[in-house]
């Protein structure tokens, strides 16, 4: 079946046009296109058309913690949020450190069929930081794993990290680092600063992140490797990234929506929903992260979507499991923090939420131009809509959103994966 998207503005630019999708590709773009007899018509008058979003950092919890999320519910949240591809992190149970697990995740994602679920392979066996996994076997498997990370913990041994970068370079795959020097964060649950001191919470210094980013930039330089920094959170990290890029080092970085919008003032409530790793930092850090995303020092937005069940969050702050939902709220938070103040345009949104992450992960069919003949991985956005976040109404199996009851701008009105409508008007299209 073909799909006709009526009255849309590609990249939010120019006059309204119709876009005809047929056989998984963009077939025609132009004003007042004829409606094919079998076409599914989407009235998107005045809406913005973007390439489907790509999330380099999600936690879908399958296998092992399906009570908090699974690939089906996570895929639904992703499609409703405008995503056509997501990367599922390796800290599952069992850990995704072998083709048995990574291929399962890939096949399950294909079975659900709402987004392309790309498994992230572990860098070290069991995330223990001691022995490299068989990255080559995972890359050669059905999932063709192209990114590896011990996210949740840092590959803190510099020799292991150096060997991982060298191994990855030979395979043409990417190492994504959770930048946290663990000896600086023992017992830490909040950003090290006045707020943590006032609340009596153990502090997590910026240097724990900055020191690993600096170290890994140098290791990547010497190995001739690519390295990707997960969830940058500190202003000092921005300065290190800028220095490394100026040196020609192949380093990329992501920022989460929650680090763009929120800061550690929220911790005053002691609500476990606000506990996340790395922690919410000071308002000045959020300002620096927004500017870095606008300037291209930070390359992309990634959600770090991390579902947790109620019993894991509704406890005292230090005992709460770290992490927040992000897939369905990501676009709206980026619009509020970046588009509304004029830091990014809609074309820039395509760059940081689709094109750059697809390029970083080397996905050939995602983040493509909105042109005839290109794959129809598409997101339609109503830029003028507003909505109120209610965790219980989100598609995720968990409800741990830090944006509960917030009014946010912009809604995803349709998502298409290879020409198939996966989500429309807030509902999944199976």
From Swiss-Prot:
GO BP annotation list: 'de novo' UMP biosynthetic process; purine nucleobase catabolic process
Pfam families: Amidohydro_1
GO molecular function (one): allantoinase activity
Active site: residue positions: 304
Details of cofactor binding: Binds 2 Zn(2+) ions per subunit.
Binding positions for Zn(2+) 2 per the UniProt entry: 151, 178, 231
Top enzyme category: hydrolase
Catalytic activity: (S)-dihydroorotate + H2O = N-carbamoyl-L-aspartate + H(+)
CC terms in the record's Gene Ontology section: cytoplasm
Cofactors required: Zn(2+)
Pathway info: Pyrimidine metabolism; UMP biosynthesis via de novo pathway; (S)-dihydroorotate from bicarbonate: step 3/3
UniProt entry keywords in alphabetical sequence: Hydrolase, Metal-binding, Pyrimidine biosynthesis, Zinc
The keyword Zinc is annotated on this UniProt entry: yes
EC number(s) per entry: 3.5.2.3
Family: Belongs to the metallo-dependent hydrolases superfamily. DHOase family. Class I DHOase subfamily.
Name of protein: Dihydroorotase
Species lineage: Bacteria, Bacillati, Actinomycetota, Actinomycetes, Mycobacteriales
